[in-house]
Amino acid sequence: MKVSIIGATGYGGLELIRLLHQHASVDIATLHSFSAQSETLATFYPHLKDLEASPLEKINSAEIIEKSDTVFIATPSGIAKDIALPYVDAGLNVIDLSGDFRLKDRQLYEKWYGKSAAPIEYIAKAEYGLAEFRDKKEARFIANPGCYATATLLGIAPLVKSQLIDPTSIIVDAKSGISGAGKVPSASTHFTETNENMTLYKMNSHQHIPEIMQQLTKWDETIPAIQFSTSLIPITRGIFTTIYVKPKNPITQKELHTLYKSTYENAPFVRIQPENVYPTVKQVTASNYCDIGLAYNEKTNVITIVSVLDNLVKGAAGQAIQNLNIMANFAESDGLRFIPVYP
């Protein structure tokens, strides 16, 4: 399969390149960048020397359609809504890593992203690509989920889908490494601001909130809202999400683990920790795994779920490739079978 990557010089694009080099059924046909053309990626990223020689090109939709079966769009939000359309119309596989096609309500997108929304007919065509819970596995146009959304939804899905929790009780405390803010630096992501520091940001206003709510209410329409906070922590990669919910009825630790184990029995990239063991960010670094730990406090009647993943892999490029594997009828783990980087 021939693929093109638009946005190849960003962190998400670079991860796509790294991972696709290990995929036996995929060849990279073209690489595209808004910020640089004609040079090779190794000009900007020396770690790719002798590994990726394709030149960076301007976006030429006719050329991409001619040379590719699949297009990955790894650009900031607000770009894919315009540039994805010809590839969808041409019948190519299109996987968008931005938020442009995730929300089915155009007004919600414009409220939370502060940008004009994509045409409604294309939003309707896009399948939300939470890989473990895809509704239409044959879909060829995928809105890849956000990193926080993936960690939260995988962490809470078994309980919500079983309607075992008080729908008003969901509290999510999510923390991200600095790469989650993207490649372009800002005052808040400057080394001197992030090193030995922790910063709460976008309190009650993170753009992944409506995305999470959209999926949760598909599973349980009685959920009215969630309390969701996000923080930056001084690591390069990783999402560490702690979720608190109250069950409708008391539940044992064994019942909790049995539910999660059965839900993810056939999910190659979700690993449920043993009882009283909780995951760390380092155990999933540079991998497509989402590791989940569970606890129940009988005194407070609160379930705590800890969900960790690499925001650039399972939270972005890795899940995008997992979605490609599903749509192409490859093994779901093709190109993604590797051990996390440790320590």
From Swiss-Prot:
Cited PANTHER family:
N-ACETYL-GAMMA-GLUTAMYL-PHOSPHATE REDUCTASE, CHLOROPLASTIC-RELATED (PTHR32338:SF10), N-ACETYL-GAMMA-GLUTAMYL-PHOSPHATE REDUCTASE, CHLOROPLASTIC-RELATED-RELATED (PTHR32338)
What EC number(s) does its UniProt record assign? 1.2.1.38
Which pathway does the UniProt entry assign to this protein?
Amino-acid biosynthesis; L-arginine biosynthesis; N(2)-acetyl-L-ornithine from L-glutamate: step 3/4
Q: Which GO CC annotations does the UniProt entry carry?
A: cytoplasm
Output one GO BP term.
L-arginine biosynthetic process
Q: Can you say what this protein is called?
A: N-acetyl-gamma-glutamyl-phosphate reductase
Task: Identify the domain of life.
Answer: Bacteria
- Tell me one Pfam family matched here: Semialdhyde_dhC_1
Q: Localized where?
A: Cytoplasm
Q: Which NCBIfam families match?
A: argC
User: What family does this belong to?
Assistant: Belongs to the NAGSA dehydrogenase family. Type 1 subfamily.
The EC category is oxidoreductase
The UniProt keywords, alphabetically, are: Amino-acid biosynthesis, Arginine biosynthesis, Cytoplasm, NADP, Oxidoreductase
**Catalytic positions?**
147
Catalysed reactions listed for this entry? N-acetyl-L-glutamate 5-semialdehyde + phosphate + NADP(+) = N-acetyl-L-glutamyl 5-phosphate + NADPH + H(+)
InterPro entries with a match to the protein in the record: AGPR_AS, AGPR_type-1, NAD(P)-bd_dom_sf, NAGSA_dehydrogenase, Semialdehyde_DH_NAD-bd
